[in-house]
Amino acid sequence: MIFIYAIIALLITFILVPILIPTLKRMKFGQSIREEGPQSHMKKTGTPTMGGLTFLISIIISSIIAIIFVDHSNPIILLLFVTIGFGLIGFIDDYIIVVKKNNQGLTSKQKFLAQIIIAVIFFVLSDVFHLVHFTTDLHIPFVNFDIPLSFAYVIFIVFWQVGFSNAVNLTDGLDGLATGLSIIGFAMYAVMSYMLDSPAIGIFCIIMIFALLGFLPYNLNPAKVFMGDTGSLALGGIFATISIMLNQELSLILIGFVFVVETLSVMLQVASYKLTKKRIFKMSPIHHHFELSGWGEWKVVTVFWTVGLITGLIGLWIGVH
């Protein structure tokens, strides 16, 4: 059955994308490009965005089928809730930008508040209604030590889900970068899930992998469509949720290492400029720094994928030992 879920997810995305692209073009749902960014990106102006809708629809349909046939499917139900919740936030943000022609989209406060609400509801569904059981201790790899967080774990969940949701969003600035890194990351968590005896989470990870594989050919350079916040916010929220449900939260620092570095580069750039009026990088997130240093877009993407694969394998090894 796992093979069937994978094929369904792959085919739905692969079929939906070429249908959605001309529709988005006709509706003029095109991406705006930052003028201060790399000049090579200006040709991307008008490329259809909100393409994340395709793999989110694929994930939802495939997951519902899995819920019907898989025993102990509560983890999939929770992951589906997070997918829809964070995806909806991203969709509203994209809609305001491309339809209302408001480049800001949702304000930071609006987006942050909505993400907090989704994270808190996730905790309530899992802890209060017992849809799935996970410890409120923060597991520290290698030292066989757990930090009991108790109620403070709610704060950690909010920080983790909101943080990684925005981290993937920041990384989605080069063709295929976030999509490829996400495929690698979900592959690591698929293996980890089965090794930690959490097959339902493993099935969801496999659905994620194949839904994204159906999207990747259209998202590679030169991209025919971007996933938009619709896709990137959902992917980050899902990553954080999987690490929480497996009680392997800190594994995400390595499995999502590139996402972490991209986010830190933005934070360091902002802090440095505010404190010293000097920039550390030529431009942030850091993938733009490498572009402005003379790297081609495809080189940056493949190097970052390679780094993601190496650190992901290390994160997987740590997570199962």
From Swiss-Prot:
- This protein's name: Phospho-N-acetylmuramoyl-pentapeptide-transferase
- List the EC numbers from the record: 2.7.8.13
A GO MF term? phospho-N-acetylmuramoyl-pentapeptide-transferase activity
**What is its membrane topology?**
Multi-pass membrane protein
Keyword annotations for this protein, in alphabetical order, are: Cell cycle, Cell division, Cell membrane, Cell shape, Cell wall biogenesis/degradation, Magnesium, Membrane, Metal-binding, Peptidoglycan synthesis, Transferase, Transmembrane, Transmembrane helix
Q: Does the keyword Cell cycle apply?
A: yes
Q: Which GO terms describe its biological process?
A: cell division; cell wall organization; peptidoglycan biosynthetic process; regulation of cell shape
- Matches recorded under InterPro entries: Glycosyl_transferase_4, PNAcMuramoyl-5peptid_Trfase, PNAcMuramoyl-5peptid_Trfase_CS
> Carries keyword Isomerase?
no
Q: Which protein family is named in the record?
A: Belongs to the glycosyltransferase 4 family. MraY subfamily.
- Where does the sequence pass through the membrane? 1-21, 50-70, 76-96, 112-132, 140-160, 176-196, 200-220, 225-245, 250-270, 300-320
Localization, per the record, is:
Cell membrane
- Return the broad EC class: transferase
Predominantly, its location class is membrane
- Phylogenetic classification of the source organism: Bacteria, Bacillati, Bacillota, Bacilli, Bacillales
Q: In which pathway does it act?
A: Cell wall biogenesis; peptidoglycan biosynthesis
